[in-house]
Regions:
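C-terminus-biased signal that marks the final domain/tail of proteins
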Residues: 1-107, 199-240, 246-357
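Internal mixed beta-strand/loop scaffold within catalytic domains of large alpha/beta enzymes
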Residues: 91-192, 328-331, 340-343, 349-350
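Alpha-helix capping and helix-loop boundary segments enriched in small/acidic/polar residues
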Residues: 194-197
């Protein structure tokens, strides 16, 4: 199986309308799964979740009214309400804030690598996306052609989201790791922040957008550019911390690593994030001539199974519910050659398919 692909053209509303019409089935899956997830993890009814998501509207409007128009188009095309699209785009803030570190659910292993660690000095980045297994059916591939100012976008969101992990024709990539914080505030939801970052052409611009304005939740954003540079930014309502590649390698999982954050944030409640970080370091650090194939192999790694880099359900015999997590895709991006390699589901079970920007 492969994800549905949609190319969005026209005005922001027209883009959203195309998105909603083309991905109506996948968006319905997102709505159904988030109704269950908000109830399971946060004890929220769907109406309560919709109401809570409205607090982020002022920050979205202040950033770009076009994003509001695009989300309205998605709602109209998919036959759902605007608030439901908004809740999908604010799902990180609704799910992950107000949680202690003991509530950690494993999500994602990310990397970036460049000279002197790669073969022919190519620049690579990527991640696994580990989340509720049922949401695997809701992932789509979104393309938005450039307009002469903003580059061509290629990203891989959950259906209904207008931002996500991906890359652009300027050779900039973006990956995401979930982090947890007890703090909560107003501000721009991380997936809207990610859309703005992907519209940038330089790493400096991307960094400025990553740290712009208040952050209502905690997240780790790894930004990499074909120029052979990368920045990793840990954000939460109290501030930011920045990590840089060491000898051409940068890796991150789901706990805080920045020097400031190590002093102010609790340890993670799950050992998975530490084990996956250690495995990523073993697979990428102090290596030479790293390639796309090497990264793909790393995403099939089962050390620490089932909560490994290639993650599998801990109770596979049980009926599949939103409580079961697994790797939903593996993504490797070659920024030098503007190519992405995507494996649906567990990379140990499915091939990586090449997609050009």
């Amino acid at each position: 199986m492969m994800f549905k692909e949609v190319t969005l053209i026209g005005t922001p509303y027209e883009r959203g309308l195309q998105y909603g019409q083309t991905c109506k089935e996948e968006i319905a899956i997102s709505v159904r799964n988030y109704q269950a997830l908000f109830a399971l993890r946060k004890n929220l009814t769907w109406e309560q979740a919709l109401q809570l998501s409205r607090r982020y509207l002022p920050a979205i409007r202040a950033l770009d009214e076009a994003y509001i128009d695009e989300m309205q188009g998605i709602a109209d095309g998919a036959g759902i309400t605007f608030d439901e699209v908004l809740a999908i785009n604010a799902r990180t803030e609704l799910l992950h804030t107000g949680l202690s570190s003991d509530d950690l659910v494993q999500e994602c292993t990310a990397f970036a690598t460049m000279a002197p660690a790669t073969k022919d000095d190519v620049v690579l980045a990527g991640q696994t996306w580990d989340f509720t297994l049922l949401q695997r059916q809701a992932v789509v591939i979104v393309r938005i052609p450039g307009d002469g100012v903003r580059p061509d976008l290629l990203f891989f969101p959950e259906a209904g989201m207008i931002g996500g992990k991906g890359m652009n024709s300027a050779g900039l990539s973006l990956t995401l790791n979930a982090l947890r914080t007890k703090e909560h505030g107003d501000g721009l939801p991380v997936h809207l922040r990610m859309r703005r970052i992907l519209e940038c052409t330089t790493l400096n611009q991307a960094y400025e957008q990553a740290v712009r304005g208040a952050m209502p939740s905690a997240a780790n954003l790894m930004m990499t550019h074909k120029d052979g540079v990368a920045l990793d930014v840990e954000l939460d309502p109290s501030g930011i911390d920045v990590l840089l590649p060491q000898r051409g390698v940068l890796v991150h999982t789901n706990h805080f690593l920045g020097p400031k954050n190590l002093l102010t944030h609790d340890h993670a409640g799950s050992g998975s994030t530490y084990i996956r970080l250690q495995r990523a370091q073993q697979l990428f650090c102090d290596k030479q001539a790293l390639t796309v194939e090497h990264a793909q192999a790393a995403f099939r790694d089962h050390k620490g199974y089932p909560t490994s880099i290639c993650a599998h359900p801990t109770n596979p015999a049980n009926p599949v519910t939103v409580a079961q997590n697994a790797t939903n895709f593996g993504l490797v991006m070659d920024l030098t050659h503007l190519e992405a390699w995507l494996a649906w589901g567990n990379p140990c079970e499915n091939p990586f398919v090449k997609i050009t920007v």
